[in-house]
Amino acid sequence: MKQNAGMYGIKLFAAVLLSLALTACQSSGDRLTVVNPDVSRTGTQTDQSPDPAPGGERKLTVVKTPEQQVDRELTVARTHRIEAASIQSWLSEDEVSIETTKLVKAGTATEEPKYEYTSSIVNINTGQSRKNTGEGGQQVKGYMLVKETISPDGSYSFIQKWKDKYIADNFVKNLQTGQTIQIKGDNYLERGGWLNADTYILAAGSMSGRGEIRQISAADGKVTAVTLDDPDAEMFGQFGASHGRIYYTDDQHVLKVFEPGQAKPVSLIQDVWSFEISPDSQYIAVSTVTQSGEFKGSKLLIYDAAGSLQGSLIGKGDLISYISWSPDSAKLAFDVYTEDKTGMNGVYIFDTRSGRVLPLAQYYAAGDPMPHPVYPFSWSPSGNRLGFTLDDPKSLLVTHVIDFK
């Protein structure tokens, strides 16, 4: 469920405080390639020294682009702006279901402000809107919210219909036949993922403790309990599944992996704040928060499915949040918050094809302070468009949609 946009600052402060308890474990000497949009079109950039900084810290580095790679660089083609709204879902490459927020009554010292919410459908290209008659699958009679996750081969979908903030009914739908099977048992968490093409893994959660891990057969809806022997995981900080493996973070922020039938997990990465598995299951984007003597901030790194570091440091700042893969796994969006104005700050895109990082701040930020997304990123079906919502002093919220080419 979405949270109030004003909670971002509170969450950010809490995240920084929590990060002070973590310990550093990363190696030194990695490089970061950041593309300056103004000069990337010409193929020339400043080449800075890649030598590690004193004390073993990674040094953020801009490298020169070979001429033959210029035509493969990711660039921004166009931007769009939707006032007072957030994206609920993409109905197609050009249409989005949005929720518009209107302040009805200002808050006082004793009363919370009151808002009015309306749903509509907007064409990104024309800006024209129409009434939402239930498209997008976000709401169904008797439920507050409906979420759907498609299997890797597109044959099935796992559907969660939330009765309220805490309890959901679960279903598996055969997208070829249209048959829907209800899965036994309530759940209290949204966390899960496709283990393979026809098996869904659900971290059901519980009002006390971590709850069950359920292995669900998409073909017949059969549920099998998955055993995990890990005393350090009273709750799951993060949870996901891919390519026959189940990934999660324990109470000590260690990313671990195990396979159904093997109850003992293997530790992969320490100091993990969040992680996202790419849709093609090839990579894991990991946001770490480390501390060694003094607060060292957050770093974004890419690992393969086995937990081996792949390539360079992708991002660095005081806090990295909302990491999100495009549907085709070609791009990774993330937001960086940094107090130091000379560091990375704002929304960035990592292009997996070129290995470059593209800053987007110039396309949505007019000046200081740097605005940051208040809800998770939203990708179009093709991955060629990215939507994100910011606080706005005039319209409460504003959603930007960036077109890539």
Regions found by a protein language model. Give the residues of each.
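Sequence signature of WD/YWTD-type beta-propeller architectures
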Residues: 25-405
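Sec-dependent N-terminal signal peptides of Gram-positive bacterial secreted proteins and lipoproteins
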Residues: 2-32
